[in-house]
Design a protein with these regions (language model features):
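Positively charged, low-complexity/disordered segments
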Residues: 1-2, 149-153
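Pyridoxal 5′-phosphate
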Residues: 4-148
Length: 153
């Protein structure tokens, strides 16, 4: 893992099989000490407990909507502002462009820079409703119940 070619370390936050959580902080430190970005896949953890991206000091974190009881085809990506400002969009169109000419284009301000074309409005409303549902139950209650179920085996 200490190769000079290392650019990104992407890791699951929580196993979907055993529910285990790897030593995120240690792996993150190792990645950053080698100049790599650290990206966390929170698909399993996001619907089970609260995640503090500042405490984890990740460069980016993502999770899918369907793991949050929401619709398929949508998810969430959070990334540090400096990373989002540095990277280029990979899909183009719509209101993501601030100004365009025959020889140049400038991107809209974040987050619109990455919002090409027509947004998935139905999926976004569905995901928001799913997150509201989880919030109503309470992540602490979900975590407590999961812990109790896991300890009974």
């Amino acid at each position: 893992m200490c190769s000079s070619d290392l650019k990104v370390v992407a890791l699951t936050h929580q196993s979907n099989v055993l529910g285990t959580i790897p030593p995120i902080s240690k792996i993150n430190q190792l990645a950053k000490s080698n100049g790599a970005l650290f990206i966390l896949d929170a698909c399993q953890s996001a619907p089970h407990f609260s995640i503090d991206v500042q405490e984890l000091d990740v460069d980016a974190i993502a999770f899918s909507g369907h793991k949050m009881f929401g619709p398929t085809g949508i998810g969430v990506l959070w990334a540090k502002r400096e990373l989002l400002e540095k990277i280029e969009p990979f899909i183009f169109g719509g209101s993501m462009i601030d100004d365009v000419s025959m020889t140049n284009a400038t991107w809209a301000e974040l987050p619109r820079k990455f919002e090409a074309g027509v947004p998935n409005m139905a999926q976004a409303v569905g995901l928001a409703a799913a997150i509201d549902y989880i919030d109503a139950i309470g992540l602490n209650n979900i975590d407590r119940k999961s812990t109790r179920l896991n300890s009974s085996h």
